[in-house]
Curated annotation (Swiss-Prot):
Keywords: ATP-binding, Cytoplasm, Kinase, Magnesium, Metal-binding, Nucleotide metabolism, Nucleotide-binding, Phosphoprotein, Transferase. NCBIfam families: PRK00668.1. It comes from the Bacteria. Its cofactor is Mg(2+). Major role in the synthesis of nucleoside triphosphates other than ATP. The ATP gamma phosphate is transferred to the NDP beta phosphate via a ping-pong mechanism, using a phosphorylated active-site intermediate. One of its GO terms (cellular component) is cytoplasm. This is Nucleoside diphosphate kinase. PANTHER family: NUCLEOSIDE DIPHOSPHATE KINASE, NUCLEOSIDE DIPHOSPHATE KINASE DDB_G0292928-RELATED. It comes from Salmonella arizonae (strain ATCC BAA-731 / CDC346-86 / RSK2980). GO terms for biological process: CTP biosynthetic process; GTP biosynthetic process; UTP biosynthetic process. The active site is at H117. Homotetramer.
Amino acid sequence: MAIERTFSIIKPNAVAKNVIGSIFARFEAAGFRIVGTRMLHLTVEQARGFYAEHDGKPFFDGLVEFMTSGPIVVSVLESENAVQRHRDLLGATNPANALAGTLRADYADSFTENGTHGSDSLESAQREIAFFFGEGEVCPRTR
């Protein structure tokens, strides 16, 4: 199977809980290689741009407000079948439906403040990675 890349966000509520290291440890324990990461505080313009596909939906303004409420950690993860495996590790978008042992079951506070984001397809992963990382900012791991 081919190695894929996926995109991950640790959202403001999870950052505030001081669980970044725990989440990274779970990524690595699940076989992901972290090949790019940074912490930043999104501007309203960045959040609106990143979530543009949801503009006009009832939850959009609340999502933008939440995503700009504190720092986030964005990462690029690499593994076989990375997109699906990462989504499985995150759990259901609605934490009420997330299986025990998933990141959202452990760190989410609500549907909007669900602790984490993961790409839903390879195409989304490529677009989301390019939104936050420029050329040379993702480091392939050969060892």
